[in-house]
Amino acid sequence: MKPGIHPEYAEITATCTCGNVIKVNSTAGKPLHLDVCGACHPFYTGTQKVMDTGGRIDKFNKRFGMLGKK
């Protein structure tokens, strides 16, 4: 690595809206404010909702399904 061209790493705090505070190393140099983190994200907490796209797929196939068939 070339000396003198790389940014300095500093320990900063990343604060989530749920109140979780995470200490990370970053080149940003100032505290971060997060919307979601691993403690409150629906995927990690198990509260994720499955979107039912079956209606959209059926509607698409109904409109364009016959175009590919000969």
Swiss-Prot record:
Superkingdom as given in the UniProt entry: Bacteria
Glycoprotein among keywords: no
Cofactor(s) listed in the protein's UniProt record: Zn(2+)
Keyword ATP-binding: no
Binding site for Zn(2+): C16, C18, C37, C40
InterPro entries given in the database record: Ribosomal_bL28/bL31-like_sf, Ribosomal_bL31, Ribosomal_bL31_A, Ribosomal_bL31_sf
GO cellular component: ribonucleoprotein complex; ribosome
One GO term (biological process): translation
SUPFAM superfamilies: L28p-like
A GO molecular function held by the record: rRNA binding
NCBIfam families, alphabetized: L31, PRK00019.1, PRK00528.1
PANTHER family named among the record's database cross-references: 50S RIBOSOMAL PROTEIN L31, CHLOROPLASTIC, LARGE RIBOSOMAL SUBUNIT PROTEIN BL31A
Free-text function comment from the UniProt entry: Binds the 23S rRNA.
Entries under HAMAP family matching the protein: Ribosomal_bL31_1
Protein's recorded name: Large ribosomal subunit protein bL31
Annotated source species: Shewanella loihica (strain ATCC BAA-1088 / PV-4)
